[in-house]
Amino acid sequence: MSGAGTATAVWGASDLRVSYGHVVALDGVSLTAPAGQVTAVVGGDGAGKSTLLRCLAGAMSPGRGQVRRPAKERTGYLPASSGIYPDLTVAENLDFRAQGYGMSRQLAAQRSAEYLDRAGLAPAAGRLAGQLSGGMRQKLAVIAAMLHQPELIVLDEPTTGVDPVSRSGLWWLIARAAAEGCAIVLATTYLDEAERCTSVLVLDAGIALASGTPAEIVAAMPGSLRSSQQRPDGDAFARSWRRAGRWRTWDPDPGPGAGDGQAIEPDLQDAVTVAALARQLRAGEF
């Protein structure tokens, strides 16, 4: 991809604030997206993931802060809606997107053939996009965002709702684009996917709770965790959650009398959960 020639480029955003009326969607959020790396943005519904990605892609402007991105024609964007036209064939969808990118017919045909082959969609080139499976449609949407070989690709939950085999195929496409020098920012609700990324930004209610490599986020988790089969009582219940058939409890100030249960080492899923609990604790919500 052409992004390989910009291996030192670092895209991203600084101190973004976005409001929808009286609702603050992002408040002081920053992110870096170096070339050749995959950056994950994680968080629950309403965390601000899509708003941040729209700002990065140039689809909207923040009320405050700066966005560093290549020119719009050097940016690829997959919105949550996918942007695929169901009444066009697979090939026609790519041709339509290529025209929007200003690609010549010859280059468009060459790239379409290349990316259809990468995605395993070449046999389906003549099928209507509306007749594809969910996984195939997402593959089409992802390669449409990659077709012009941009320097920055922004993907809003590209693997949500697809089968495990299609998820694996989508990640192969994403990893290859990064290996070829493209900077990739993606939103995901799957923390196992975030663990594969170079860096992770954790959002909650428009606020950045944590950022860094997956290992750095885990290492920075405050307090300690314990696991038990029994439901925690009292104040500990507000700091507990179920996972893999057991209760996990976060102790902000661990000590000899922290509580019952077995001490465990956290992973990224635990660290993200604790980051949200720590914010609630600071806000006096429990």
Language model features: what each stretch is:
Residues 42-44:
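The feature captures the beta-strand-to-loop junction immediately N-terminal to the Walker
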Residues 57:
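Helix-to-loop junction immediately C-terminal to a conserved catalytic motif
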Residues 95, 99, 106-124:
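Conserved ABC ATPase "signature" region
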Residues 128-135:
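Conserved ABC ATPase signature
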Residues 146-147:
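ABC ATPase C-loop
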Residues 153-157:
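Catalytic Walker B motif of ABC-type/P-loop ATPase nucleotide-binding domains
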Residues 169-250:
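ABC transporter nucleotide-binding domain
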